[in-house]
């Protein structure tokens, strides 16, 4: 792909609390800004939600995603018809052998404080919890078996294939689609977005971010802490990133340039 044909900005954004966060006016402002520059923006939804939710969302929103990463990074699709990306699916399938779910179930049955989420897809197992202490015991047992675990938003517990989360899947997706990392802005608000910030991609953590995420991103100078919530926080960073282009590493003290946009 020639540089002249490269998209100016790739926005890879979490949904709940981020792209869908804020009030109605803030969401409308973000969506209108993207719509006015639609040919310049590649929009990637990166969510813990599944494809059914995202298909409906794509029908309801005034802007639709070009690509989607769902189920905390364990499922990927491209285009309006949510077509699979063969190279990514092969990697995900290899990381999730047929007996993995059974192995997880054996451990989780010993921890009744973990309650299954009623609907989830992808290559994962997902649960609700109330108290973190007992869940940390289960997490230790599962990690010993070779799984990754993720606690977020003080209620969600995900068991994932080792090495598979939003961030790692996003990097593979960008590579598979020929999209440049240095033109990519990631956005999120909870701990299940941390792996996106850990990639080193330029990022924005919106103001309604989970306290645990705020603490976790402290060493990551690639992340801008927006003072705006949800969609307003995304727009706050997106306007600057889109205008200035490649400035990965430019952020100082977790702040994007304060240049008027």
Place the predicted regions along the sequence by residue.
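Short, Lys/Arg-enriched N-terminal segments with co-localized hydrophobic residues
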Residues: 1-5
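Conserved acidic, metal-coordinating active-site core of Asp-based
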Residues: 103-199
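Mg2+-dependent phosphoryl-transfer enzymes with acidic/Ser/Thr/Gly-rich catalytic loops
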Residues: 160, 167-261
């Amino acid at each position: 792909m020639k540089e002249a044909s490269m998209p100016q900005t790739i926005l890879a954004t979490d949904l709940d609390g981020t792209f869908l966060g804020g009030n109605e006016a803030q969401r409308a402002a973000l969506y209108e800004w993207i719509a006015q520059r639609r040919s310049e923006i590649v929009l990637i939804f990166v969510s813990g939600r599944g494809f059914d939710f995202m298909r409906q969302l794509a029908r309801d929103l005034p802007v639709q995603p070009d690509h989607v990463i769902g189920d905390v990074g364990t499922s990927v699709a491209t285009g309006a018809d949510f077509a699979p990306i063969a190279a990514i699916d092969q990697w995900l399938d290899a990381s999730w052998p047929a007996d993995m779910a059974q192995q997880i179930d054996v451990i989780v049955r010993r921890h009744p404080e973990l309650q299954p989420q009623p609907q989830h897809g992808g290559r994962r197992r997902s649960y609700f919890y109330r108290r973190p202490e007992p869940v940390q015991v289960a997490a230790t047992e599962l990690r010993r078996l070779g799984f990754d675990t993720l606690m977020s938003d003080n209620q969600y517990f995900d068991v994932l294939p080792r090495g598979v989360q939003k961030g790692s899947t996003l990097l593979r997706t960008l590579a598979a689609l020929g999209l440049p990392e240095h033109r990519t802005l990631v956005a999120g608000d909870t701990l299940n977005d941390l792996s996106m910030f850990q990639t080193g991609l330029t990022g924005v953590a919106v103001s309604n971010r989970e306290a645990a995420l705020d603490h976790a991103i402290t060493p990551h100078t690639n992340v801008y802490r927006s003072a705006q919530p949800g969609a307003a926080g995304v727009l706050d960073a997106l306007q600057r990133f889109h205008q200035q282009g490649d400035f990965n590493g430019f952020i100082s003290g977790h702040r994007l340039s304060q240049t008027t946009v």
